[in-house]
């Protein structure tokens, strides 16, 4: 997560907004990391690079 915290604010906001929208619309179980990555305009690998797991991203929110 430290890598995520070192990102520029706009990039962090884009990822967080995408995650909030996906989780809010589909719920935790039906949201995939691929959905979040696509909405944020980054690769799925980068989401895992920043957070490690979907659960870690969810708890960050």
Each model region followed by its residue ranges:
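Short hydrophobic/aromatic patch on the recognition helix
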Residues: 42-51
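Basic, helix-initiating cap at the start of DNA-binding domains
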Residues: 1-26, 31-42, 56
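Alpha-helical DNA-contacting segments of helix-turn-helix folds
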Residues: 59-61
